[in-house]
Design a protein with these regions (language model features):
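Sequence context surrounding c-type heme c attachment/ligation sites in exported
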Residues: 170-268, 702, 714
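Primarily short, surface-exposed interaction patches in extracytoplasmic proteins
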Residues: 37-67, 72, 77-109, 125-162, ...
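Bacterial N-terminal signal peptides
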Residues: 5-16
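Globin-like tetrapyrrole-binding proteins
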Residues: 790
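Extracellular beta-strand elements of beta-rich domains used
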Residues: 328-330, 400, 414
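Disordered, acidic Ser/Thr/Pro-rich linker "stalks" and the adjacent N-terminal cap
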Residues: 267-308, 317-395, 405-408, 422, ...
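N-terminal pre-domain segments of enzymes
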Residues: 19-37, 482
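Short, surface-exposed beta-strand/strand-loop-strand elements in extracellular ectodomains
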Residues: 408-420
Length: 804
């Protein structure tokens, strides 16, 4: 009996000891000693291979190696000239290959390729998602920032800090990271208090998931409703981290920098131009009749401008009767009504009367119009009145809509109060005069004592004023980007079961204990909270930040990561296949100044990367998926590399970088009715990373190749092989048109000889000469059905679609 008790006690002690030991990913990184006789990466891989009695494969031939590394680092195939130069280089392969790698890493194409991997992780898109899926017109600035940062080899610790606290570090565009995901913003679903609170919790949850899974490989979001079931993350940790971002808001913000300074310098000249035009108009005002009546529902659109309040001044009505309104709405670039009383907007007005005392004044901004049951707000005095709405937080407005109580003409002005306190006019009565593109004849515009020519001149003058005001508003607002903006942080509450209506206790901002010892002062200013988190995560000894990043890079080079679950390094994730290598890479990455390009160079110059991909029967029996890396694992290219490759091979690739993207669909936002475009001009022949990214909408053709729709994080893309992929490429108007361009290029460069044409087609598309059987088959196909069909089939071949 005593022996049994002793045994049970020992089991308890052992179990307790195991339970107390931190999970592998939370333990300090260990630096292994590496033999100087081989490449450091090969040193770790060969040890695992020996355990299974396996060996490396032979090195790939130079042509295969060049195509592999070129597609891997730039996403584009090498040109025949580049293949010839590398194949004929008399230097040792190590030396010649290193020069190739440095050339590719220095190419602007490198940042375009690897930015897509990062955007997948954080599910970046240019629409909101959820029920509205409205457009984020200025979100492309963040995409361009990522591309530029990767091309400049911005150290990863700086890359991370800029994205968490770019307003402090001077990288405004980087703040697009925090609001990259979908957002169900307050007021979009429901306007009652519970719906508003839930929406706010949801949008902050998206931020926490982006940061925790994208940067740290931890599912902190699982602790929103209760303590994490598997990892040492408490519910208090979740809300403490939420408090770090409690001042964050989604929307447009002003982009500081040279462009902003340039725009600001142009404002005085534009103001003078506008003043001169208005003086010219005033001299003719007496000739104008009273403006046409307002429609019962009227809208004014203008250049996006960030505002904290809006006011409408009604100077006169047609018959001197009192002005009246049923509803007043201020619409943001995200499709949200910022004037909603339920969203915290506060209306005020000059003295007024109610047509029926049962209608509250705040009904003006309740987002609902029902003339059968509602009664309008009516100014107490005829002729003039004003209405003002102060927003709960600054909003980027693009249009104003109001529902007039009666269709009487009005003389009005609408102004917004910018964050700096200045008022800016965005709409006024003259906006309702005919534009210079009005389809009506000049004789139909009723102006007193004016000929048709004089009327048209006046209409053109008013149109010029309107255009100039739009230009002035745009300059005064400054360049806009879609990125996180910040206000005084909301109070953060610990919520019972995550229910926003069941508040338990106030919580101060805090870094979760699982991430290591760090403190944020309870009263820390909003930006200092985020900066403290960023500095903590980029400490050289942090156990997660570097591990997670090097694993992502490894995965995108070999198809699989050292950890199979790149965004979950917790207990529900997988253990690393080569833990010593993972730690060594992470520490070396930090030692090399967090340089991503040095990390790429280290990986692709290793022997395991340069192996042939040919299968070996004995090795396949032991490790069919080549997880131990006894050969280079072949894989299908991603959708972007396939489309970009087609354009490159056809000679139509437009290498213009940056700016607003081209469209795959007939519209840029909305929940439904997306129609894929069938033809593209030169702008649509840019690299696919520059396509306008619509959330929740698969891209025509290339969606079949597992191109994610940004509805969810995609730390690792699916690599399916289906008949739909081949059918899509064979029947796609885009692919067929590029095949025709491809054939035309081949004819121009190879002449009329069939053999020479097929040879060049293979060298362009596959970076190699065709095998005799391939030459014969494609030549026969070209003779019977035309060179276009041979090129079309080549686009569908494994030699083109796969990285070998």
């Amino acid at each position: 009996m005593q022996c049994v008790r002793s045994f049970l006690l020992l089991c308890f002690i052992a179990t307790t000891a195991v339970a107390a030991e931190p999970h592998w990913s939370l333990q300090p990184m260990k630096c292994a000693v590496v033999s100087g006789e081989s490449h450091p990466i090969d040193f770790f891989i060969v040890q695992k291979l020996r355990e299974k009695k396996l060996t490396f494969s032979a090195e790939a031939d130079r042509v295969t190696l060049l195509r592999r590394v070129t597609l891997d680092l730039t996403g584009l195939p090498p040109s025949p000239a580049e293949v010839r130069a590398f194949a004929r280089d008399a230097r040792p392969t190590d030396e010649a290959f290193m020069e190739v790698v440095d050339r590719l890493l220095a190419s602007p194409r490198h940042g375009e390729r690897w930015a897509q991997h990062w955007l997948d992780v954080i599910r970046w898109a240019e629409t909101v998602g959820f029920e509205t899926n409205g457009e984020r017109a200025e979100a492309w600035h963040y995409r361009d920032w990522v591309i530029h940062a990767l091309n400049a080899d911005l150290p990863y610790d700086k890359f991370l800090c800029d994205q968490l606290a770019g307003d402090i570090t001077g990288a405004d565009a980087a703040l697009g990271f925090l609001v990259a995901g979908p957002a169900n913003l307050p007021g979009q679903v429901g306007r009652d208090e519970e719906a508003m609170r839930s929406a706010r919790q949801d949008e902050l949850d998206e931020v926490i998931r982006t940061v925790s899974q994208g940067l740290l490989g931890l599912t902190i979001g699982c602790a929103r409703c209760h303590d994490h079931k598997f990892d040492p993350i408490l519910q208090r940790d979740y809300y403490g981290m939420q408090a770090v971002f409690a001042g964050l808001r989604y929307g447009n913000r002003r982009l500081r920098g040279e462009q902003n300074d340039e725009w600001t310098s142009q404002v005085p000249a534009k103001q003078k131009q506008l003043a001169d035009l208005k003086i010219k108009l005033e001299t003719q005002r007496g000739q104008l009749e009273l403006r046409k009546p307002l429609d019962s529902v009227h809208s004014d659109e203008f250049a996006p401008v960030t505002a904290r309040a809006i006011r409408m001044n009604i100077r006169a009505t047609a018959n001197g009767s009192a002005a009246s309104l049923y509803e007043f709405e201020a619409w943001t670039t995200d499709g949200t009504n910022a004037a909603l009383a339920s969203g915290g907007a506060r209306p005020s007005a000059s003295s007024f009367a109610l047509a029926n005392q049962t209608r509250d004044f705040e009904n003006l901004t309740d987002g609902s119009v029902d003339r059968r049951q509602a009664f309008p707000w009516v100014a107490a005095k005829g002729g003039s009145a004003w209405l003002r709405v102060d927003f709960a937080e600054p909003a980027t407005l693009k249009s104003i809509t109001w529902h007039d109580g009666s269709s009487v003409p009005a003389d009005y002005t609408i102004e917004v109060q910018r964050p700096d306190g200045e008022w800016q006019r965005v709409a006024h009565t003259e906006d309702r005069l005919p534009r210079n593109d009005d389809t009506r004849a000049a004789s139909q515009v009723k102006l007193k004592n004016l000929s048709a020519e004089q009327t048209q001149a006046l209409v053109s003058l008013i149109a010029t004023i309107r255009k100039t005001e739009g230009e002035l508003n745009r300059l005064a607002a400054g360049p806009q980007i879609y990125a996180a903006s910040f206000t005084t942080p909301d109070t953060t509450w610990l919520l019972r079961r995550g229910d926003p209506m069941q508040r338990l206790a106030k919580l101060a901002p805090a870094i979760p204990a699982v991430l290591g010892q760090a403190e944020i002062a309870p009263g820390a200013p909003e930006p200092r909270r985020r900066l403290a988190l960023a500095k903590h995560l980029t400490q050289p000894g942090h156990p997660l930040t570097a591990r997670v990043l090097v694993n992502r890079v490894w995965q995108n080079h070999f198809g699989n990561g050292l950890v199979d679950t790149p965004s979950d390094f917790g207990k529900m994730g997988t253990a690393p296949t080569h833990p010593e290598l993972l730690d060594w890479l992470a520490l070396e990455f930090i030692r090399q100044g967090w340089s991503l390009k040095k990390l790429h160079r280290l990986i692709v110059t290793s022997r395991i990367y340069r192996q042939a991909s040919h299968p070996r029967e004995q090795a396949l029996r032991v490790d069919a998926e080549a997880r131990l890396l006894w050969r280079f694992p072949p894989r299908r290219l991603e959708a972007e590399a396939i489309r970009d490759g087609m354009l490159s091979v056809s000679g139509k690739l437009n290498l213009k970088m940056g700016g607003r993207g081209f469209d795959f669909f007939n519209q840029r936002g909305g929940l439904s009715d997306y129609v894929p475009k069938q033809t593209f001009d030169a702008n649509g022949w840019r690299r696919m990373i520059y396509a306008h990214k619509v959330r929740m909408q698969a891209v025509d053709i290339f969606g079949a190749f597992d191109c994610p729709d940004a509805g969810q994080m995609k730390p690792r893309r699916t690599r399916s092989i289906t008949p739909v992929q081949s059918l899509s490429l064979l029947n796609s108007p885009f692919a067929n048109r590029q095949a025709a361009f491809f054939a035309g290029r081949v004819r121009r460069e190879a002449g009329n000889g069939a053999a020479a044409q097929i040879n060049l087609a293979f060298r362009l598309a596959c970076a190699r000469a065709p095998k005799p059987s391939e030459q014969q088959a494609r030549q026969q196909l070209a003779m019977e059905h035309g060179l276009e069909q041979a090129c079309r089939v080549l686009f569908n071949s494994s030699a083109f679609l796969y990285l070998q």
